C-alpha cells in the first residue's frame, strides 16, 4: 500500500514538473513562433485585428523584398567575415592563455589568475571609451578591426577559465612523455593537449560564434558606413524615417539571420553540453 502511494506521488510529481516545463517552453518559444508566422504574412494580415497566429495567405514577399531592399546580402557577408575571424581568434587565443596558466607556474600565477577572474565582473561599458579612443588614434574606427582584434588578445576570461579547468584535468605525464620524445612546448600544446580538449573547444566555438554573430553594441559603436554594417545593425534599416516599421520584412530578415546560429547550435549541441559539463566537473 505504501509502495503504491509512493509511486502515485512520484507520478503526480512528474506530471506537475513536465506541465510546468512545457508551459515555460511555450512561453519562451511563442515570440519565435510569432516571428516565423509574421515573416510569411502580408502587410494587411499583420495589422489585422484580432491578430491570428497563422497567416491567411502565406507569402515569400517579405523575404524577397527584405533581402533586396536593404542590400541584406552585404550585411550577411560582413557578419560572416567578422564572426569567422573573431571566433577563430577566440578559440585560439583563449586556449593558448589557458595553456600558460595550467602548465607554467610562477609566483605571480595565482595573482594573475585572480585578476583574470576579476575581469569577468567588469562591465564592458567601463572600458568602452578608452578602447574607442585607442582605436580612433590608430585609425581603425569604421573598420572591422575593433570587432576582431580583442578576440585575438585572450578571447575572454570565461573561455580561458573553461580551458584551464580542462587542461588541469589532463595528467602532466602526457607533457613529460612528449618532451622525452623530443617535442617542444608548442608541439605538446598543439599535438597532445588540443586534441584532448575538443569538447571544450567546440563549446567555446559555439559561444563565440553566437556572441559575435548577434553582437549589436560593438558594431553600432565602431562602424559608421552602412556598407560595413553587420546583420544586427542592418536590421534597423527596416525602420522608416517617420517611425513606421516594415515589420514583415524585419521579421523575415531576423529569421534569416537566426538560421546559421540555430544550425550550428543544433549540430554541435551534444558537444557543447559535454564541454561545459566536463569543464565544470574536472580540474
Predicted regions located by residue number:
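A structural signal for multi-pass alpha-helical bundles of membrane permease subunits
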Residues: 4-283
